[in-house]
Amino acid sequence: VLHADETPVSMLKPGNGKTHRAYLWAYATGAFENTKVVVYDFCESRSGEHARRFLGDWRGSLTCDDFSGYKALIASGVTEVGCLAHARRKFFDLHAANQSQIAEFALQQFARVYDIEREVKELSAEQRQASRQQHTQPVLDALHRWMLLQRQKVPEGSASAKALDYSLRRWEALTRFTGDGQLPVDNNWIENQIRPIAIGRNNWLFAGSLRAGQRAAAVMSLIQSARMNGHDPYAYLRDVMARLPMQRASQIGELLPPRWQPA
């Protein structure tokens, strides 16, 4: 199981001193996986070819939003896992705009799903799947029937129709988590790993070149992966830098954040 997301980063154009929008792509192992790693990939654009190049022939479950850049991966055999938080956000915005009763009811049902998720978070994958099948699936089945009924009533092109269509169009992917205890309910896990990058943009403003962005992405991958594994990033990097010159190439994996032990 992998999570994927991307965020814009300004990159300096060579020669003219101006910047253009590049992207930092992020890929993280699932929140329920034993190995916790995030890898950032700095690229010149948001083209889906970057995700295809990075993931290569990997074929697993990819948690992502509705961005078209992931569609070719899904068409090639990657299993799409939707983000229920994105679906919920459509109704949240709808309710904030006009106190929609449709949005209010949908939000109540999403809240029920998330209440169950909080209860099963620490369970085994098998127990989580059983609980989702018993408790979550009936809620989602009823919500789906209700959405289909409401869609027949609302005007085409209305804000309500757009919120409903987002969920209905992606329903299979959005509810895939109920059949597998290893799958997440949403993509918030990767968004949390991108948040430090978004905050950092206010301080470092732009990448000086493509190579500079790629080097920064490599270092940030180590730092954030260290955090994910409960390590102090400074202590981790200091220890690794001291040991790296003497580390055998065959044992270099021992210095990666999931396997690192302080000397």
Ranges and model annotations:
Residues 1-263:
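Catalytic center-proximal scaffold of phosphoryl-transfer enzymes
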